[in-house]
Amino acid sequence: DGLATDGYQSMGYSIRYEAGIFKQKLVDGWQTELPDFWLPGGDVWLVPREERSVEVKFEGHVEESWDGDYHSVEQKDCNTVTAVPYDMYVSGKGQGVSRLRLWASVKPSLDMSLFNQGEYMRAMEQSAMAEAISKILYPADNSPEGKSLRLRQQYFLVSASIQDIIRRHLTEYSTLDNLPEKIAIHINDTHPTMAIPELMRIMLDECGYGWDDAWNIVTKTVAYTNHTVMKEALECWSEELYKRLLPRLYEITKEIDNRFRAYVWCTTHDADKVERMAIISGGVVRMANLCVAGSHSVNGVSALHSEILKETVFSDFYSITPDKFKNVTNGIAFRRWICQSNPLLTDYITKLIGSDFITKSNELLKLREYKDDKKVLADFMAIKRQNKERFAKIVKKRNGIDINPDSIFDVQVKRLHEYKRQSLNILNIIAEYQMLKANPNADFVPRTYIFASKAAPGYFMAKKTIQLIDAISNVINNDKDVNDKLKVVFMEEYNVSLAEVLMPAADFSEQISLAGTEASGTGNMKLMLNGAVTLGTLDGANVEIANAVGDDNIIIFGLKTPEVEQLKQRGYHPMDYINNNRVLKDVIDFINAGIDGKTFGEFTSSLMNVDPYMALADFADYQKAQQLSAEIYKDKERFAKMSLMNISGAGIFSADRAITEYAENIWHTKPVAFPQEKSAPAPKKEAAAKKPAAKKAKAEKSAKAAK
């Protein structure tokens, strides 16, 4: 949408998955995964382009030969699959249209030689393996078979896409010498990393380039965006698996590694640094290192994240090639998350400042002229109330729970991961529950905690956390002593459609990851755009949200990134925080005693013994932040002003802005100039036809003209 709206020629590539990651169903609080079939249904938007199909090769062995000065390489006895493209057209706000090309994997044909030899199952297995590649998004990779399928998916995507890019370029220019001037290939995270050696393979094996010329072209063409600082997400593949599945690509990757090692040694004469920066080391292929080595640009997705990349994750690379490193803060599909999701708010903003903000998001800053207008603030709160009522009906229908639209809607919606610290939120909820049980008449602002998230199928602790949320919600929501003041809701099967109803209803946006662990986040931007006030740590894009709205319009708590590092160096001891905080100790004891007939020893044991993301260290400060949010909400005018300031400051987080920064600073491209539409001539005033026949003739004439 952003590329099309801004007028940049673009083609996105992905896989035509038959099913999404999974549909989430809680059974006795435990997440179970059901198939989420995308096809049929979604394919109504797809245009098949079988004539553009390409072949992708796996396994086999490599044979090399020389004919004079000509070097020939052939991959033999390989398993071949056909990548069939399907195009989806994405129109922007205006005349621009982007194309998303999705690849479906099919076996070229049944191996009749195997079939005729009676090896029916083996023949069918080959077809099944080919089709499995585009069967499901993110198959579980906690088994050798799962890892193999993931690697096949990644190579299938990059091989088909790079072949398509090269074909289209050669059709236009008949040479690859000008590839960097005409094409920008952007690697989004490490999943498409193999685009680098695959582009080298085509240039070396199919186009006859020498290594140095090919590498020069590749590294000027490819750019890389990193999306995480989590070590487990910086992909590493078993060298043995990589070599077995992709024999030719392994040879090229190995040569890249050898040459890059030599370059680093000549530059630094530091053997330790050579090993840290190596692409292949310790029996694994490091995809993030390959990305940085093979790209002309490396960027993070928030100002803090980009600094962390330079200071820690890729510090060795930064010390050698500092000019590679840039920042482009994430942006969101602005028009979806306000115009489509929140039509009431969109209409009211249009009434106040006009409609230019729909394509020029910084126009929202004009709303600040109304920050002291009590009538406008009251209108904003009335719209928020209507959106909360709309969401409350969804909760009643899906969960059977009545929630109070006048209570605080405290929202934490994101994937379930320990670093995102849903655990910290739960600890505070239990503390509030215990306080209300002990003091039923306490002055407590009614609050509804809303969770929505999915856990990776093989991530036990994340699933256990969901079960804990479900258990405590059952206890609280059925306790008549507190349920008029405190409610907890977990929304199953969180997706974009649910988010479009939930985000306009949120009062406070929980962005509470440990400082230094979240690359950026985009949920924080979507919630901010819809008037939610951020309650969070100085992590990811929260830093830039704070800059955009001012310290008075955001609630910040917790350790800062340098303080986290200092605490790690001194030695972090979770039990110290439990022993020195009676409220926290009571919460841990409450969980250890079991909740709703379930036990959560693994959850508390992790916190007490390790607490890898320092939830206990931030607990006391988090409680203060929650208490402050309640005080703010009680002052309706103050809360309304903070909400307006967040909406008005959200324009900087539009994807349109992010796309422009990528285009200017990384891709070095300019938008296409669309022909200006001619103004329609003023209609001539015509006398009304006296006879129906005259009307009919006129209508037929107009229809022919239109055709």
Regions picked out by a protein language model, each given a short descriptive name:
Residues 676-677, 703-707:
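Regulatory N- and C-terminal appendages and interdomain linkers associated
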Residues 1-685:
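A conserved ligand/cofactor-binding region detector
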Residues 682, 687-702:
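Low-complexity, polybasic segments enriched for Lys interleaved with small residues
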